[in-house]
Amino acid sequence: MNFVGISSLVIVAFFAGGNAAWKPFSPEETLFTYTRCMEDNAKGDLALAKKWMAWKLEADQKSACYAKCVLVGLELFDESSKTFKGDHIVEQYQKYKSYTSQDEAGVKKFQQAVQALGTIDSANCLKVLQKYGPVHAQFTDVQRNVYFGKKEITDKIYNSDYTVKKRDETMFRFCERSNFKDGSEELCTLRKTGITTNNNHLDCLFRGLRYLDRNGNINPDEIKRDLHFINVKDKDAAVDNALNNCKVKEATKATDYNDCLWKDPNLKDIMMPVFDYREVRSESYRYFIENTDPYDVAKVKEKVKKYDKDAGC
């Protein structure tokens, strides 16, 4: 249920818009899920996180909640109905099967095993892991093959897919490379002000930051989380107000929300430090797993200067 060699895991960051039919998870999405669940449940305990990286799940509270978090994130467990879901496992496998030697028969057995778990009477972390644990133990290798738990699989994707986000590349620079010419006035203005009319870029960025979820819905909690990380904890209501009063068109959703945040009188002075720190952290999804240092605005600015230079600005 976890992954090996996460530090070398590559990221494919193709984010499509709209409420379309279900789409297989990319390596970027699974990596984000794994690391965010580690961040939330290991809470600075690197030794424990390393156990999860080694696919070791013990029956303790933190490990159980990590496991449940990943299952929910990969849509293998629906918390509201307390039901295990294997509906899309084969579809997930088929999307990337050319990158793995995994046979489909094994995937179907894994799917059947997940489906057979059915509904449980409680979504308690320990109850979820107790139920899923035997399936995890039996199909660990299949899970790693299907949900990008092997470096050799992700390396192949990294080397062959033009949409691959490079190792140690920030989400901001990835989206910028796809939508602007380095050194262009438009890009440099964006990096100085946070404002652009390029909706393709902002859609890529908002999805990459999880400000928009997989279905294209705004996620206020993720924005507030980023404010909290720069020690701004009294603006939650301002975020809600800015988003709730934002006039949004489907075709320009990301641009509209971005404008509403950056131009709000209660938020305009903090959005740049929010974005700067998130850019630094997006360079490695393991940032908070390995880095326990408090927010340091001077260090963040030094890092951002390097990103600006890389952008030709």
UniProtKB/Swiss-Prot annotation:
<keyword id="KW-1201">Platelet aggregation inhibiting toxin</keyword>
<feature type="disulfide bond">
    <location>
        <begin position="37"/>
        <end position="69"/>
    </location>
</feature>
<keyword id="KW-1015">Disulfide bond</keyword>
<keyword id="KW-0732">Signal</keyword>
<comment type="function">
    <text>Modulates blood feeding of female mosquitoes on vertebrate species by binding and sequestering different mediators involved in the host response, such as biogenic amines and eicosanoids. Binds serotonin, histamine, adrenaline, leukotriene C4, leukotriene D4, leukotriene E4, arachidonic acid and U-46619, a stable analog of thromboxane A2. Does not bind noradrenaline, leukotriene B4, ATP or ADP. Inhibits agonist-induced platelet aggregation and hemostasis.</text>
</comment>
<dbReference type="GO" id="GO:0090729">
    <property type="term" value="F:toxin activity"/>
</dbReference>
<feature type="disulfide bond">
    <location>
        <begin position="188"/>
        <end position="313"/>
    </location>
</feature>
<feature type="disulfide bond">
    <location>
        <begin position="175"/>
        <end position="204"/>
    </location>
</feature>
<keyword id="KW-1199">Hemostasis impairing toxin</keyword>
<keyword id="KW-0800">Toxin</keyword>
<dbReference type="GO" id="GO:0019863">
    <property type="term" value="F:IgE binding"/>
</dbReference>
<feature type="signal peptide">
    <location>
        <begin position="1"/>
        <end position="20"/>
    </location>
</feature>
<dbReference type="GO" id="GO:0005549">
    <property type="term" value="F:odorant binding"/>
</dbReference>
<keyword id="KW-0020">Allergen</keyword>
<comment type="similarity">
    <text>Belongs to the PBP/GOBP family.</text>
</comment>
<dbReference type="InterPro" id="IPR006170">
    <property type="entry name" value="PBP/GOBP"/>
</dbReference>
<protein>
    <recommendedName>
        <fullName>Long form salivary protein D7L2</fullName>
    </recommendedName>
</protein>
<dbReference type="InterPro" id="IPR036728">
    <property type="entry name" value="PBP_GOBP_sf"/>
</dbReference>
<dbReference type="Pfam" id="PF01395">
    <property type="entry name" value="PBP_GOBP"/>
</dbReference>
<feature type="disulfide bond">
    <location>
        <begin position="246"/>
        <end position="260"/>
    </location>
</feature>
<dbReference type="GO" id="GO:0005576">
    <property type="term" value="C:extracellular region"/>
</dbReference>
<feature type="disulfide bond">
    <location>
        <begin position="65"/>
        <end position="125"/>
    </location>
</feature>
<keyword id="KW-0964">Secreted</keyword>
